[in-house]
A protein has these predicted regions:
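Phosphate-interacting basic helix/loop segments used at nucleotide- and nucleic-acid interfaces
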Residues: 76-101, 204-205, 286-287, 388-395, ...
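Metal- or metallocofactor-binding catalytic centers and their adjacent structured scaffolds
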Residues: 244-277, 285, 451
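N-terminal cationic and glycine-rich segments that engage phosphates or anionic surfaces
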Residues: 280
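C-terminal or mid-to-C-terminal helical accessory/interaction module adjacent to the motor/catalytic core
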Residues: 83, 96-97, 139-224, 268-272
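Structured, non-catalytic alpha/beta "coupling" segments that mediate domain-domain communication
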Residues: 29-59, 199-245, 396-443, 617
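Basic, low-complexity terminal or inter-domain segments flanking catalytic cores
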Residues: 2-3, 35, 121, 177, ...
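Intrinsically disordered, low-complexity regulatory segments
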Residues: 1-166, 170-174
Length: 690
């Protein structure tokens, strides 16, 4: 019997169905579904894991934060321990009757490690088991049949690269998190997370916030006019200078506007709008962010679509379709859907289909593309939105460029030159079917040199330069990729970790005071941790392991030596770290200024000595007894925002498994419904601060 191991139970069921023609027999082994099938002449058992079934950890003697010096963890032994004991038991039991293991996990660094670990567990029961590899990029009949027809060797170097990543992240994360948390007395549920990838990522967000805070707006002035032709057509023009940095210059130009204008020249250009490139993981996250999806939500939904056989593997860097994909057949398959029939027809009527190409080309997986035509009714609302985005992107990569005509007319008004710009799409092509791309036509009438125009209005606007925008999750993932922070499989989880730790909130992302303090400390005393350079270097070393150029032991030892250098500096400034972080944590607990008359106190999160319930109270207690009730579950974060209905402070609640939500602390806020006012919130003064 052959033992086939997949990464998830849903994938196991699908693979079993494809290989057996839906002739699988399901049995539960220690509560784990195992699918027994016949594939050709071979009897097989197919079992699905839950991702990693083993984790790395230090021996138990290192578990006490208060008794173990964090530095001692750097050279400590690392163990592998079970995460899902029932799956480990089931794997061993089934392996006892197996003659061969076939690894059918996702083909990437993490998938190879998951498969390797499962093989090692199976070997504990049956030491004679050899392992082979089934490589595929889609859970479709053709891909699975092809993969099992030409099994390959397990890529041990790729698995060892994944193990190196586990070891390094454990060492760096445990040592730095324990040291910073203990130094600032932020332990147990209040610990301060620091990590090899998350800290430089957090630094990007904090640096942008500091840049915004230090931004000094520069005033400028814009002069516009409104014109009318003798045919009654109205349009607008802006002074050629666009921005006047001196008000007197803008006023001078403005004062010359009177009477009529004369067209000096008209220039027309036609530019080509290239179709979008095929989706890889990063570009999918960026595009999905524009329709309201977080990075984690995008990957989770994409993973589900992949597991159900609707799209190809969603973790890929590739942006070039390989020749092995029959693009035309996929379009024909999609044409049966009313939602995409029009776009499919436009693709198929071309004499030759020439797909667009991105800059990145890899051989492990193709770009993300649809593998099955599924109806809207079979998917949830969010699943359909992402599936539709992927399908439309795929179809648009197969369509010709669009064409946009731009018109620029220079107009003389009192010796000052104004420019009227117009543009309109003259050939839609892919633009017609990709409604995520927005182009607003700007109308100006047909003009000729020497034509006289009546001035019907004028304006001089006071404006100022804007600070750089905060990172959205999509843009942050893009920046992380650019700097070599994390991988396509881990970037979204890094962002989620920063959110769950209370370091960042919202989208665009805003750092907490605690986050700003941690980053400032790291930049001041351990710049290697906050810089992307060290992390990027280690990522390249792990790629070297995958290529066979370096060993896991060499790279892990190199990272240990790096960390030892960092810890020498940090231990010398432990007292400074303690003071700076304690101050920042205190700032994070300030909800806002007290609203009571003649009180200068701050509203802070407190805990009742009697009920042990948390509430918001004034730090001027007992002089001021103002209080507000709070939800008792979830992490509370300050937002610095004021309620638009009552001007009271707004807080953000983060609860595991729920979308973060904002709450006005005022129980009598006119923006809250009566049910909430009566049952969920108390008036100021109702919660004792004893």
């Amino acid at each position: 019997m052959k033992l086939i191991i997949s990464e998830k139970e849903i994938a196991a069921k699908r693979i079993a169905g494809i290989l057996s023609g839906d002739g699988q027999k399901e049995e539960k082994v220690y509560g784990v579904p195992v699918y027994y099938i016949k594939h050709g002449s071979d009897e097989c058992a197919v079992i699905g894991l839950k991702g990693h079934i083993l984790k790395v950890d230090f021996p138990k003697e290192y578990s006490n934060w208060f008794k173990v010096d964090p530095v001692d963890l750097i050279d400590a032994e690392i163990e592998k321990t079970p995460i899902h004991k029932n799956i480990v038991q089931a794997l061993k039991k089934v392996a006892g009757n197996a003659s061969e293991v076939i690894i059918a996990t996702d083909f990437d660094r993490e998938g190879e490690l998951i498969g390797y670990d499962a093989w090692q567990v199976a070997i504990e029961k049956n030491s004679l088991l050899n392992a082979k590899r089934a490589k595929f990029s889609a859970l479709t009949n053709s891909d699975i049949d092809s993969a099992f027809a030409k099994l390959e060797k397990l890529d041990l170097n790729l698995a060892f690269a994944g193990r190196a990543r586990q070891d390094i992240d454990l060492i760096w994360g445990a040592v730095l998190t324990r040291f910073i948390s203990l130094a600032s007395y932020q332990v147990k549920e209040n610990f301060l997370s620091v990590g090899r990838v998350q800290s430089p990522t957090l630094t990007l967000i904090v640096d942008r916030e500091i840049e915004i805070g230090e931004f000094v707006a520069i005033p400028y002035w814009v002069v516009n006019i409104k014109l009318k032709t003798d045919r009654g057509e109205e349009f607008e023009a802006t002074h050629k200078k666009k921005r006047f940095l001196k008000k007197e210059e803008a006023s001078k130009a403005f004062s010359k506007i009177s009477g009529e204008g004369e067209v000096l020249d008209v220039n027309e250009t036609i530019r080509s709008m290239a179709p979008p490139t095929p989706f890889n993981t990063t570009s999918l996250i960026v595009s999905a962010n524009s329709i309201g999806f977080t990075a984690a939500k995008t990957i989770n939904i994409a993973e589900n679509l992949y597991m159900n056989g609707y799209i190809s593997y969603p973790r890929t860097d590739n942006t070039v379709y390989p020749a092995s994909i029959d693009l035309k057949e996929i379009v024909k398959m999609l044409k049966v859907s009313d939602s995409f029939a029009d776009a499919c027809s436009d693709v198929l009527k071309q004499s030759k289909i020439t797909p667009s190409r991105g800059k990145k080309r890899t051989t492990d997986h193709p770009p993300i593309y649809p593998t099955f035509s599924v109806s809207r009714q079979r998917l949830g609302s969010d699943e359909w939105k992402l599936y539709e985005l992927i399908v439309r992107r795929f179809l648009c990569t197969l369509l010709p460029p669009g064409q946009i005509k731009s018109i620029a007319a220079n107009i003389n008004v009192g010796g000052e030159v104004f420019v009227a710009n117009g543009s309109n799409i003259i050939k839609e092509n892919w633009i017609k079917h990709y409604h995520y791309y927005k182009h607003e036509d700007v109308y100006i009438p047909n003009l000729v040199p020497g034509q006289k125009l009546k001035i019907i209005d004028r304006e001089m606007l006071d404006k100022e330069t804007k600070p750089p925008a905060r990172y959205t999750q999509g843009k942050l993932v893009e920046k992380m990729e650019e700097l070599g922070l994390g991988t396509k499989a881990t970037r979204h989880t890094i962002i989620q970790t920063l959110i769950s730790r209370g370091y960042i909130t919202g989208n665009p992302l805003v750092p907490s005071e605690k986050a700003i303090a941690v980053v400032k400390i790291l930049k001041k005393h351990a710049e290697k941790i906050s810089s992307p350079d060290m992390t990027s270097e280690l990522e390249m070393d792990m790629d070297g392991i995958a290529r066979g150029d370096e060993t896991r032991e060499e790279v892990v030892e190199k990272s240990r030596e790096m960390l030892k250098d960092v810890m020498v500096n940090l231990k010398n400034v432990k007292a400074d770290i303690s003071q700076e972080i304690k101050k920042a944590v205190k700032e994070d607990f300030i909800i806002g200024k007290c609203r009571q008359k003649d009180c200068d106190g701050n509203l802070i999160v407190r805990v009742s000595k009697k009920s042990r319930k948390r509430f918001i109270g004034c730090n001027a207690y007992p002089k001021c007894t103002s209080t507000f009730s709070l939800p008792q579950l979830g992490m509370i974060l300050t937002t610095k925002d004021k309620c638009k209905h009552c001007d009271y402070p707004v807080i953000r609640i983060i609860t595991k498994g729920r979308k973060p939500w904002d709450l006005c602390i005022n129980g009598d806020c006119p923006g809250k419904d009566e049910k909430y006012k009566n049952y969920k919130s108390k008036k100021p003064g109702q919660e004792s601060s004893d």
